[in-house]
Amino acid sequence: MALAEKFNLQDRFLNHLRVNKIEVKVYLVNGFQTKGFIRSFDSYTVLLESGNQQSLIYKHAISTIIPSSYVMLMPKKQETAQEAETSENEGS
């Protein structure tokens, strides 16, 4: 399997939550809890939005992310096709 084809669970999970606008609860290592929608993420941070408030949270401070609905991660080819359908439907 080529390096580019490796299954990256964290990125695919966060991207699924972002694309499908699934609300999440985020628990931090200090016990603080917040909830909202993931707007963006990179290697080190997650941008969480709740109402008109944004929080840039460092990943090393996150203990757990709990989505409000079940997340089914599919093989990459199926997921890419589904995301393309979602994008087409949003444009309609």
UniProtKB/Swiss-Prot annotation:
InterPro entries linked: Hfq, LSM_dom_sf, Sm
Residue ranges annotated for the Sm domain, each copy included: 11-71
UniProt KW Iron-sulfur keyword: no
tRNA-binding among keywords: no
A UniProt-annotated Pfam family: Hfq
Keywords for the protein's UniProt record, in alphabetical order: RNA-binding, Stress response
Gene Ontology cellular-component terms listed: cytosol
Domain of life: Bacteria
GO molecular function: RNA binding
SUPFAM superfamilies for this protein: Sm-like ribonucleoproteins
Family assignment from sequence similarity: Belongs to the Hfq family.
Quaternary structure and interacting proteins, as annotated: Homohexamer.
Protein's recorded name: RNA-binding protein Hfq
Source organism per UniProt: Thermotoga maritima (strain ATCC 43589 / DSM 3109 / JCM 10099 / NBRC 100826 / MSB8)
Name of the coding gene: hfq
